[in-house]
């Protein structure tokens, strides 16, 4: 986002010219106005709630930041101890499309002796029309148990993406809906997602719904495969029923909740959704540490072994720079583990075109050179972030797909990956 100032006068129209050149698969432009404040207003504190009959405010004091965070966790819950492997390098992309993809890429890390702990399965491992089934599509993942066994035999870990979203034709939707635990506005308005199917999200504020949601996950992804899933990626946990929607309609799509109106409880969806998975996994396998990665967070989420990443950021230098501020602010808020889509998620068209040209000609043009340096610099930054996780859309994000082995970008990425592991004991 970019900030600029334009002098305006009361009652006088002021022309504003905005030049916008979208570069990427999906691009959005919005304009927000920050009205200037008077000197008197600058020295005042105003706290308000859009919709709440009562509100408690807490002031947590301390002699230093550690004491403040300790007080925050006394109030909201202690941070759970994550599995040690979560501190290592994670390889992800949008997306691995088969069990063969998963196994071959992990094996290549091992063959090249490049450290990695976690390989991540993003969305759409299910049949195209079966979002919410939590089932691997047999044509692309014929033997999920064998895939998981192979990952573990290579001393890897497997994380999988699960959304609180269901197409209205799948069995899991119908089971939850029969109890009255689905949000219906999206169905009523006949909203179809970018793949052309209709669905909605479940009401995670209902304890019964949470238990059923976990049971469906467990039956299809966890107990079914001998607890072979090591971690859960809980995506779209705002909940993001529909992309790029005005706030008033977002609230309509995600309510009413079991506790009350969505306006009153809007920001807390991710923590009740995390509650479902944390307590669900502990109930069936108490000897395995839980780990969740979620796109949105709420106060106290650390007690559910949950980390948060900063969402679908763009592959731009300014976006990488913004992550430095975001990560510091997040960590000071009392939640210990934070991460980002290292390398940027949404890719500018010029980088895509540059990679396509290289694939055809073997020539590195200026845009590809910049792409490779950006990936290398972002990996250097990521080495010192709590969660060291590469992820994004095409071009592919494995180091050998970013640059050849004799390229400075390749050498830099591998060097910082190994540095991460040397620093891990500290």
Residue ranges with predicted function:
Residues 19-21:
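Beta-strand-rich extracellular modules
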Residues 1-14, 23-28, 34-426:
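Catalytic-domain carbohydrate-binding cleft regions of carbohydrate-active enzymes
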């Amino acid at each position: 986002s970019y900030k600029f100032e334009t002098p305006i006068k009361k009652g006088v129209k002021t022309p504003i010219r905005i030049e916008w050149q979208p570069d990427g698969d999906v691009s959005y432009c919005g304009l927000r106005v920050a009205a200037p404040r008077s000197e008197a207003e600058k020295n005042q504190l105003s706290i308000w709630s859009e919709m709440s009959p009562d509100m408690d405010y807490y002031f947590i004091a301390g002699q230093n930041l550690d004491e403040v965070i300790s007080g925050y966790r006394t109030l909201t819950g202690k941070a759970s101890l994550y599995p040690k492997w979560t501190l290592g390098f994670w390889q992800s992309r949008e997306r691995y499309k088969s069990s063969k993809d998963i196994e071959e890429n992990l094996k290549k890390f091992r063959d090249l002796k490049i450290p990695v702990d976690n390989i991540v399965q993003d969305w759409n491992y299910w049949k195209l029309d079966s979002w919410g089934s939590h089932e691997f599509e047999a044509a692309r993942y014929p033997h999920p148990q064998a895939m998981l066994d192979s990952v573990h035999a290579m001393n890897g870990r497997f994380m999988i993406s699960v959304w609180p979203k269901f197409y209205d034709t799948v069995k899991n939707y119908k089971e939850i809906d029969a109890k009255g635990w689905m949000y219906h506005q999206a169905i009523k308005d006949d909203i179809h997602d970018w793949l052309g199917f209709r669905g909605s999200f479940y009401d995670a504020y209902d304890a019964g719904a949470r238990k059923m949601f976990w049971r469906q996950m467990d039956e299809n992804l966890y107990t079914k495969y001998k607890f072979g899933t090591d971690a859960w990626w809980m995506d779209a946990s705002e909940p993001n029923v529909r992309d790029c929607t005005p706030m008033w309609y977002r609230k309509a799509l995600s309510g009413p909740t079991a506790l009350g109106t969505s306006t009153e409880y809007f920001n807390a969806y991710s923590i009740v959704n995390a509650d479902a998975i944390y307590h669900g996994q502990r109930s069936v396998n108490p000897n395995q540490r839980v780990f969740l990665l979620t796109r949105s967070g709420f106060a106290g989420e650390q007690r559910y072994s949950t980390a948060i990443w900063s969402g679908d950021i763009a592959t731009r230098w300014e976006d990488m720079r913004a992550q430095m501020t975001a990560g510091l602010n997040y960590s000071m808020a009392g939640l210990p583990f934070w991460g980002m889509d290292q390398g940027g998620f949404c890719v500018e068209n010029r980088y895509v075109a540059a990679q396509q040209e290289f694939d055809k000609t073997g020539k590195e043009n200026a845009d590809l050179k910049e792409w490779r340096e950006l990936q290398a610099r972002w990996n250097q930054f990521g080495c010192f972030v709590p969660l060291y996780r590469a992820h994004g859309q095409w071009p592919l994000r494995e180091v050998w797909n970013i640059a050849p082995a004799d390229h400075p970008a390749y050498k830099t990425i591998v060097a910082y990956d190994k540095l991460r592991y040397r620093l891990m004991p500290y």
